[in-house]
Regions:
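N-terminal amphipathic/basic membrane-interacting segments and domains
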Residues: 4-7, 11-339
Length: 339
């Protein structure tokens, strides 16, 4: 969200009129995606190979976590040390656009809005073993069985009958076919669900889901192997101080420091009077690793590794051809400037 300010007057301590805006401090949004895998053993797992002829049944319940991805995105937070007053001439048509936090987005034109696009979590699919849902497909014969081995035998026979019924439907070897296509799909779906539930009694089920957490990191200086979060086998994504997890490290190396512009003679340009301040950010290589492999590596713009300069405010109030400009809210740098 942003707001356009047209001739909005704010009085500062110098008794001048204009609009106060902020340049940003660059923060890093660290998005962490972890996958949780839940395995559940079926009550007849020990009979899977005997009655179904299938090895590899899950023999005990378990949960495990694995790191799926890490993404780092810079974003801007107003820097209280970098607040500026932009003055307006009475009766002028110029305007500036700020975001909801007071960061400068554009002057005399509509802004380009950047946003952090978060990864959507993947929900855990239902399992026939959840809350003993498989009991819904128990036949009367199975319910009357006196022992576990007998129940497994009856469940296997019921499973084979379901498979045979589905095959007969598909091949048309039934006394009466469903009335229409939708009825046929519904019957096949019901048979599939019953087969899945009975198979789960022997083979167990595996469910996966993704959990997403965000961590805020403020670059201040170069760092090596700063722990930003951990991955725990028991709890998934946890904070750095939770020693139950394996650490994930952030290293930051400044690759470019923002410098003040120079003129044709190689001298540093003078700041224009009542300048419209903007940032010339630096850059830093940001690396995240688990100590063995690199999870993320990118060169990112960072406002606090640069400098602040300014534009001559008169270019925005020229009556014949006023200039316009857009800015990056992540760094306060000029995105584009023109007429």
């Amino acid at each position: 969200p942003y707001r356009r300010q047209r001739q909005m007057c704010i009085r500062d301590r110098h008794n001048e009129y204009g609009l106060i805006y902020s340049l940003p401090q660059t923060h890093l949004d660290i998005e962490v995606v972890a996958t949780k895998t839940t395995r559940k053993a079926g009550p007849y797992y020990q009979y899977a190979e005997k009655y179904l002829g299938i090895p590899g049944a899950i023999t005990q319940d378990s949960e495990e976590w694995a790191l799926s991805s890490v993404k780092v995105t810079p974003y801007g937070v107003p820097d209280p040390e970098e607040q500026y007053l932009m003055q307006f001439k009475p009766g002028g048509n110029g305007y500036i656009v700020l975001d909801e936090n007071g960061l400068l987005l554009s002057i005399n034109t509509e802004p380009v809005i950047d946003s952090i696009v978060s990864t959507a979590p993947k929900q855990k699919q239902e399992s026939p073993l959840d809350n003993n849902e498989y009991a819904k497909v128990y036949s009367a014969e199975l319910l009357m069985s006196a022992s576990t081995v007998k129940m497994a035998e009856v469940a296997a026979k019921q499973l084979y009958r379901i498979r045979e019924s589905r095959l007969n439907l598909v091949t048309g070897e039934v006394d009466e076919l469903p009335a229409d296509g939708e009825s046929f799909k519904l019957i096949i779906q019901q048979l599939d669900e019953q087969e899945a539930a009975l198979t789960a009694l022997f083979m167990g089920t595996t469910q996966t889901e993704t959990i997403i957490k965000h961590f805020d990191y403020i670059p201040v200086e170069e760092v090596t192997n700063d722990i930003v979060f951990r991955i725990s086998d028991l709890y998934g994504i946890v904070k750095p101080e939770n020693l139950s997890g394996a650490p994930v490290y952030l290293s930051l190396k400044i690759t470019e420091e923002g410098e003040l512009p120079i003129d044709n003679k190689g001298n540093i340009k003078k700041m224009p009077k009542n300048a419209v301040a903007y940032a010339i950010p630096g850059k830093a290589e940001v690396i995240l690793s688990d100590g063995k492999k690199t999870l993320f590596k990118e060169n990112l713009p960072i406002a606090q590794f640069g400098v602040v300069f300014g534009l001559d405010p008169s270019i925005f109030t020229d009556k014949k051809a006023p200039s316009c400009a857009t800015f990056y809210p992540q760094t306060g740098a000029i995105r584009q400037i023109g007429k």
